Regions:
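A short, surface-exposed helix-loop junction/capping segment
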Residues: 38-46
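C-terminal active-site-capping segments
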Residues: 33
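Basic- and aromatic-enriched surface patches that contact anionic nucleotides/nucleic acids
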Residues: 4-7, 15-27, 46-258
Length: 259
């Protein structure tokens, strides 16, 4: 089967299993959420997908927080005590993180950022200050219907006025913490990932695997996926957004292991 043809194969179906899970709602304000990201309590499933929002969409989300408008709830999966992985809401949480840092990732560098986040748990200041990777995060809005500029246009986190900054910092965000009680594995997260939509797009099984299983072997697979010889063999210079190229590598190693 040609590599291009493989990309067209339907993702596998999985059977439904019953789980005993606990779901606990928590309302964290925006700055608490940012602190949890900074400290690594909330980990970014960086193998899941790149940050895909543009500045206009990110600006609308930040505006919603400042105005106190309701936003979709965040779903977190409890891996262990004080350690959570994002099930649904990565784009929103990264937007908060980037806005507080006042830096917005350039579109051509987002695969690199995913790898940096996975290695460090956050993005070092030396990377944030690199203008080839980031630009200033200034809110971007069109003029209002009466022709006046939008009051938040070109605002950065530190240039918000006192009322705007306070509204943003203290805005509560509903976070649903999910913990699997039985069976004693992480199996339920597959079902949760597949049933929750992020931006209207379902996660592929390989994206789910990448979020769950982090090891030196997986790091090696993702590093190999970036190698020029492999990219030439695949016939695509850019890594696949749904990580189907990674899945080809993973299945190839599985075949070698099975003999």
């Amino acid at each position: 089967m040609a590599m291009a043809d493989y990309y067209e194969v339907q993702d596998e179906e999985t059977s439904v299993v019953s789980y005993d899970i606990s779901v606990i709602p928590n309302d964290f304000n925006v700055m608490t959420i940012n602190s949890l990201i900074e400290s690594g309590v909330i980990s970014m499933p960086t193998f899941q997908r790149n940050y895909v929002w543009d500045r206009k969409r990110a600006s609308r989300f930040i505006e919603s927080l400042i105005l106190g408008l309701p936003i979709p709830q965040i779903f977190l999966y409890q891996i262990e005590r004080n350690k959570y992985s994002i099930v649904d809401g990565q784009q929103r949480l990264l937007t908060i993180y980037f806005f507080v840092k006042q830096r917005f990732p350039r579109s051509g560098k987002r695969t690199l950022l995913r790898k940096i986040f996975d290695e460090n748990g956050n993005i070092p200041d030396s990377v944030l200050s690199d203008n080839e990777i980031f630009q200033d995060f200034k809110l971007q809005f069109a003029k209002q219907e009466n022709g006046d500029p939008h009051p938040l246009n070109n605002k950065k986190y530190h240039t918000l006025d006192v009322a705007q900054k306070s509204a943003f910092d203290l805005m509560p965000v509903r976070c649903m913490s999910i913990r699997q009680n039985k069976p004693e594995d992480n199996g339920s997260i597959y079902e949760i990932f597949s049933r929750l939509n992020t931006g209207g797009l379902n996660l592929s099984p390989q994206e789910i695997r990448g979020c769950l299983y982090r090891s030196d072997f997986y790091k090696m697979i993702y590093a190999l996926n970036s190698e020029p010889d492999w990219r030439n063999l695949v016939g695509k210079a850019e890594e696949d957004d749904k990580f189907r190229d990674v899945e080809v590598l993973l299945r190839s190693y599985a075949l070698l292991y099975d003999g």
